Regions:
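Bacterial N-terminal signal peptides
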Residues: 5-16
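Short, small/polar residue-rich loop motifs at catalytic or cofactor-binding pockets
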Residues: 39-40, 101-102
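SH3-family beta-barrel domains
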Residues: 19-35, 45-49, 54-97, 104-132, ...
Length: 143
């Protein structure tokens, strides 16, 4: 009886789980986002370093993805890496000197600015922009 209970538990565990989507980020200074898998497809928009994406599928050397706004596009796999990044999702975000609202604001950024994750402390993320600016941001302000 214990074996059947255990087997049932294992089957439920492995068949009901949701697969985690692979998350990547842009590694080049600027990357073209295209409408399909190839340079013959239209450029939809351009993104900068550390722009995070969620992989939907792969086709040869091309990756179909979704971004923080739900937009989909294609990017060549040579232009991405697995570094952990975030992007701001609020219109105005304070970047602080330390992990907490008791720390001074170093600068503010608008929605859609990508950052490399350097460290985490509870609900705070230490970030670095491609231009070298660093600071701390609350996790509720990023995707």
């Amino acid at each position: 009886m214990r074996f059947i209970s255990f087997l049932t538990f294992v089957i439920i565990l492995f068949t009901s789980g949701v697969a985690m989507a692979e998350r990547l980020s842009v590694s080049s200074k600027i990357a073209n986002i295209r409408s399909g898998p190839g340079t013959d497809h239209e450029i939809l928009w351009k993104v900068e370093s550390y722009y995070p994406i969620v992989v939907l599928k792969k086709s040869g050397a091309w990756i179909n993805f979704r971004d923080f706004e739900g937009d989909e596009g294609w990017i060549h796999r040579s232009l991405v890496h697995k570094k952990a990044t975030v992007i701001t999702i609020k219109n105005t975000c304070n970047v602080r000197k330390g992990p907490g609202t008791n720390h001074d604001v170093l600068f503010t950024v608008e929605k859609g600015i990508p950052f490399l994750i350097m460290d985490r402390q509870k609900n705070w993320i230490q970030i670095k922009h491609a231009d070298g600016d660093r600071g701390w941001i609350h996790k509720s302000l990023v995707w």
